[in-house]
Design a protein with these regions (language model features):
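Membrane-interface helix-entry/capping residues at the boundaries of transmembrane alpha-helices
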Residues: 25-29
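Alpha-helical transmembrane segments of integral membrane proteins
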Residues: 1-24, 40, 71-187
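Membrane-water interface segments at the C-terminal ends of transmembrane alpha-helices
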Residues: 31-64, 70-82, 105-111
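Short, surface-exposed linear patches
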Residues: 57, 64-66, 138, 146-147
Length: 188
């Protein structure tokens, strides 16, 4: 989930900063605000209703369907790894389909926070004197954002990623409860 949030959130925040107060910025801010402000348990319930009950695109609650639950021996107690060890490819696909929605929702929460903060840090960098000098030298706005401002904002962005990881551990408890997933939330 943190990988999804970082791989999508940082470029989304950079695009929002590059096109500040224009359509891509407004759309990106709406997506990041939705991911950051909506409760994770509500997103989980809506995701289950839409993508599992109505569309049937993902697996439902639990780690596996009942048909596969007892066919896979528990070696590591991590279903994806246990199904690979057992060579049960259908069970692997089933376990992966059960993992997609919870991981995506946690990734959406991480994406929202990382994108908002990346945009904020980059807008601050774009107001600095060195970006004015780069503009006067004729460098394009995208080159300034992606080559210079993003590099200078990397320190605060890495700090936010670490804080997001801690925030996701908190959200994992609710996500695991909604999706009946016995994970790290049982131990916290």
């Amino acid at each position: 989930a943190i990988v999804l949030g970082v791989l999508v959130g940082i470029p989304l925040g950079a695009i929002c900063a590059q096109y500040a107060n224009r359509l891509p910025d407004h759309l990106g801010r709406m997506l990041s605000l939705a991911g950051h402000s909506m409760p994770i348990f509500w997103l989980g319930i809506v995701g289950l209703l839409v993508f599992y009950a109505q569309l049937g695109w993902v697996g439902g609650p639990g780690r596996l369907d009942v048909a596969y639950r007892y066919s896979v021996p528990a070696v590591t107690h991590l279903m994806l790894i246990d199904t690979l060890i057992a060579g049960e490819w259908d069970a692997f696909r089933n376990a992966f389909s059960h993992l997609v929605l919870p991981a995506s929702l946690l990734g959406l929460v991480a994406l929202g926070y990382v994108a908002r903060m990346t945009r904020s840090f980059l807008l601050w960098q774009l107001r600095q004197d060195y970006t004015t000098v780069l503009r006067l030298k004729g460098m394009s706005e995208s080159a300034i954002v992606w080559r210079h401002a993003l590099r200078n904002a990397a320190g605060p962005i890495l700090s936010i990623i670490a804080l997001t990881y801690a925030y996701l551990l908190e959200g994992a408890v609710l996500t695991e409860t909604v999706f009946a997933w016995p994970g790290l939330g049982m131990y916290i």
